Regions:
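Non-transmembrane "mature" sequence context
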Residues: 1-128
Length: 128
């Protein structure tokens, strides 16, 4: 299983070797396609995505914030569902709170507000 435990992000640009590597591990666990990953990252150019993946670089503050929220969602789900398969499956289940849509679908709408909405929901479910 990919290691996603070492992500530390802040509002300034950060080297992708830290945040982006953690995001890629998360994307693998959640079985996200390249197009889905690009959506979650805030739709950077495909060339930028592949540059980050190959050579590293710096992510914008918006991208750092997105990755931070996604990692928090992942960690909250691990607390709520100690069995990893159940935590990952939760993303695909439909939830009344999201208008009978899955959290994955809400996340893939691509707006930062939607990522925050999913994060706030899972944080509330775990009592955080």
């Amino acid at each position: 299983m990919p290691d996603v435990s070492n992500i530390e992000t802040h509002r300034a640009s950060v080297p992708t070797t830290d945040g982006f590597a953690a995001f890629l591990a998360l994307a693998e666990l959640w079985r996200l396609s390249t197009d889905q990953q690009i959506i979650l990252l805030g739709a950077p150019a495909r060339s930028t995505y592949f540059k980050w993946k190959k050579d590293g670089g710096s992510m914008s503050p918006d991208t750092v914030e997105r990755v931070s929220h996604l990692m928090a969602i992942y960690k909250a789900l691990q607390i709520l569902f100690p069995i990893p398969e159940r935590a990952d499956a939760w993303l695909s289940r439909h939830h009344r709170f999201f208008g009978n849509r899955s959290a994955r679908d809400v996340l893939l709408d691509g707006k930062l507000e939607d990522i925050i909405r999913v994060r706030e929901y899972v944080d509330a479910q775990r009592g955080g």
